[in-house]
Amino acid sequence: MSAKKKDLLSSAMKRTSEWISSQEVSSDVTVHVGEASFSLHKFPLMSKCGFIKKLVSESSKDSDSTVIKIPDIPGGSEAFELAAKFCYGINFDMSTENIAMLRCAAEYLEMTEEHSVENLVVRAEAYLNEVALKSLSSSITVLHKSEKLLPIAERVKLVSRCIDAIAYMTCQESHFCSPSSSNSGNNEVVVQQQSKQPVVDWWAEDLTVLRIDSFQRVLIAMMARGFKQYGLGPVLMLYAQKSLRGLEIFGKGMKKIEPKQEHEKRVILETIVSLLPREKNAMSVSFLSMLLRAAIFLETTVACRLDLENRMGLQLGQAVLDDLLIPSYSFTGDHSMFDTDTVQRILMNYLEFEVEGVRLSNNGVDLAGDMERVGKLLENYMAEIASDRNVSLQKFIGLAELIPEQSRVTEDGMYRAVDIYLKAHPNMSDVERKKVCSLMDCQKLSREACAHAAQNDRLPVQTIVQVLYYEQQRLRGEVTNDSDSPAPPPPQPAAVLPPKLSSYTDELSKLKRENQDLKLELLKMKMKLKEFEKESEKKTSSSTISTNPSSPISTASTGKPPLPRKSFINSVSKKLGKLNPFSITPYNGRGRTKPPKDRRHSIS
């Protein structure tokens, strides 16, 4: 049919539709759309809707009135009403709120050029291309409305066009986008500068209305156009805060969430974690801690939780105490309040990153300061969890063993944690109290801490004697230094190290790094051994066969402390201790060196 004939036919149909409306001709077709019913006329509908034309021709011709049902039209009765108005020539407004359902309904009803000139499909496409997809906020609105119109919105490529328009315009608006990729080595420096003053673009709040799958596709399209991944941090933070709102991740109450809603939030969280920037300092530790709490609460995949733990370990030097106080979310009374196992894994990750940083960087001052901050943080954390009576001795000692020895200038923080733990667990045996007190080096206690420890009746006698002995040695040294204080030697010119001494220093630093590596390997083996022992205990307790009284489990049930056993870890530790020719004390499994005994003043 030629274009001229189509125009003539369209004009005739329009005049006929207007005449039907003006003369109030009785309806001859009833259309049921969901729960709504429309009494209409066949001619205006069939002249523009190929789908209705098929339904009318297939219906019975005997009856004067035809009844047809359209149960699954996109947009429901609202969309069909607008399409019917278009068929009758009644004016209505197209907007960003209704253009998505109009376009999908027109596709469903087959309102194409084959049936009428300038039909609804063409009119809707013109509005999309000329108005809706020309602004960022309108494109986001159309995409949001299209989420309820799948799969037909995908078929007409409405979703993909909206996503492409959003990605293009966000890259034009934001300063995080550059067509050429910058040097990857400079990423960390840039992120450190951005993290101090995070920039949130005006469109970030608009993106939070999207469903998680649409949100993910938009961010991926933005990165494909050159948007820097570390610039997505504020956007992800806004989306997570809005979508995960209402979760009881800071309390210890029972879960108050429906299974369906829990599944939806779990998918949202796992997707957000997969989109997090890989650069260091791109996200704050507090935000990562919030995500980790939610991941434990929602029981996400293990990979999701381990990813968050690795990220927190990488930035542990920036954390505060509240970031580590993660509830255990165990709803039985025999579990500790805080999840110490998670913190233990975070600290393990931190130690691995620090060892790798020592190898790759010569800036030892920054690493030492960072490690000192982590040491103080862990001491405060241990003091916080020490008051919990459900924290076992094994967990308390295991955490203390992981605190780097070089990070603790004084032992006051560890003494405070030990004292709180002894006060909260008054029924411990003498052997157990000695184990707890062996975590601190009495030689590094300050004068105030020594004065408190000397009068602390919760400490074992041996520990009090050590404190008094070292305090006596300190006073004796101070008196000797005051009486025999020589004149300061004249300043000497800086001497250049001889080649032999320089090589000796290099060898010594190399051996120190090797010792640190061996410590980490031992800690990993201990963690694996503890997990294996926990699994074997669970299997033994669940079996119906009676346990052998001589087994370690039956010994623990009698209430008596188990005898020390020779394990593979202990044997490896003793062998590794002999590898160091410079008498650098290797990691002894407790994170502390025992004070040397003075045979003339030994009391034990």
UniProtKB/Swiss-Prot annotation:
What are the boundaries of the region Disordered? Answer: 478-499, 532-604
A GO BP term here is:
chloroplast accumulation movement
Q: Where is the composition biased (Basic residues)?
A: 591-604
Q: Where is the NPH3 domain?
A: 201-474
Q: Which InterPro entries match?
A: BTB/POZ_dom, NPH3/RPT2-like, NPH3_dom, SKP1/BTB/POZ_sf
UniProt biased composition (Low complexity) = 541-558
Q: Which SMART domains match?
A: BTB (SM00225)
Every copy of the BTB domain together lies at: 27-96
Pathway involvement? Answer: Protein modification; protein ubiquitination
Keywords of the record, alphabetical order, are:
Coiled coil, Phosphoprotein, Plant defense, Ubl conjugation pathway
GO CC annotations on file: plasma membrane
Quaternary data: Interacts with CAMTA3 and CUL3A.
Which PANTHER family does UniProt cross-reference here?
Answer: OS12G0117600 PROTEIN
Instruction: Return the domain comment text from this UniProt entry.
Output: The BTB/POZ domain mediates the interaction with some component of ubiquitin ligase complexes.
Protein name, please?
Answer: BTB/POZ domain-containing protein SR1IP1
- The source organism is Arabidopsis thaliana
